[in-house]
């Protein structure tokens, strides 16, 4: 019996070593063959979740590239940004979205819930280092194992055929508008479910230490590579439920990020039609905000605290 168990252990250990070996080798080859250079050669980079994804229309802002993506925790933002920042020396300033919902405990859900993990591992697994993969495996082993087996199967096929023509979707500006009548009922149902979750989460006052850890890693990485970091909070309507953690949000910012410039646009003057909900801008709102932000960049005052700037559209 002992001999049998020993053989099982040796087999599993060998399998794990083989899988990690294939993962490491294929990841290195993919990174080597992938082109992370941004065609526009931007001076400014925007990172974050759905709020900046909907707010920064980079076609209206000279020298800026928006790589924000909805539902993205700082964990994935950090790993996907490393090669982009390394390979684009023209980037001088990185604007990172930092708002009330970024500190919420539910942002852990954005990292290792299977819906988010599976989708992002399939795109970014070659960018995530062993430390990050072990963390994902620890928090959701079934999803991690299933997804990585799928990824490695694809990778093995690519290794055998020498096919490394990868094109990675890293995020970007997303055009938004009011809901059309034929999708409004479905979207309203989903919105109501999310509102219940967000309402509970915003009132719990618990924070995501995990998400904040990777925000700090991202900041330190940018500094190490000579990039200025500016935190940005985007427009939010007064009815937005995450205003309830404003005290905690302010405390965390002052305790951990007080040395960084903070552009606070939370109360930026916009009309109701400039929003698609309480925290995301419509196409019209994004155009208004982006035009203002583009002018701000030209004044070179974006390194200042937003309290010293004029909030005129």
What are these regions (language model features)?
Residues 26-44:
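Alpha-helical transmembrane signal-anchor/signal-peptide segments
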Residues 111-217, 221, 225, 310-313:
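Secreted/periplasmic serine-hydrolase-like ester/acetyl group-modifying domain
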Residues 244-313:
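C-terminal regions of proteins
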Residues 6-24:
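Hydrophobic membrane-insertion alpha-helices, especially the h-region
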Residues 216-242:
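Active-site segments of SGNH/GDSL-like serine hydrolases
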Residues 72-75, 205-211, 237-245:
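Acidic-and-aromatic substrate-binding clefts and catalytic sites of carbohydrate-active enzymes
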Residues 44-48, 281:
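Short hydrophobic beta-strand that contains or immediately precedes a catalytic carboxylate
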Residues 51-140:
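Membrane-embedded segments
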